[in-house]
Amino acid sequence: MSAVKRTMLLCLALLLALWSAVCGETVSLPESLGVNASQGTVQDHWDGHGAMGDGTEYWEIAFSPEDAAEFEESLQTALGWHALPLDNDVRYLLYGTEGIEKAQDGAYISVNPYLTGKDGSPLFPRIEEGYWFFCDEQTESYTAQGVRERPSQNFTAAVYDSQSRTLYCGELDT
């Protein structure tokens, strides 16, 4: 009887090991990005959403030189993607202002970033060469105009660094 129990326990252990190997965590980017980044390697991912669904989620995905060329080509025709530099509305949401700045309407403003990391600093590094993406999930549009004036913000933003071949993506739900 004990040999049967041992055999069953061994089979159960093997089954659990196989199941955990097959059913590992998969990280999927927001569908609103409209691009396939599955050929990249996830360098970092965390989800800070709470029980009510508010919070921030972050992805960092690196690409090989070959895959980066194909990925960059897809960004050129995907909805919501633009070559850098960022427009001012998106820049304010992602990085805030550096001290007090004169806005386009002539007013002086100081804005903290909305999309921040766990330490409160901007979630994305500053990038000189690449592409950016923004999708306002509340209006289902690819513009950041008016987002800061709302009592809640729900958006997905991403920047792709052509030099390091890295995609940074973040989602904010408030």
Positions of predicted regions on the chain:
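Gram-positive cell-envelope targeting signals
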Residues: M1-T26
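Sparse, context-dependent recognition of short Cys/His-centered cofactor- or disulfide-binding micro-motifs
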Residues: A3, M8, D44-W46, T143, ...
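Extended hydrophobic/Leu-rich segments
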Residues: M8-L10, L16, L75, I109, ...
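Short, well-ordered helical secondary-structure segments
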Residues: L10, G48-G50, V147
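N-terminal export/targeting and maturation segments
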Residues: W19-N88
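Functional cores of ribonucleases/endoribonucleases
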Residues: H82-T166
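Conserved beta-strand-loop-alpha-helix junction that forms the acyl-donor binding cleft
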Residues: G170
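Short, solvent-exposed mixed-charge patches
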Residues: D173-T174
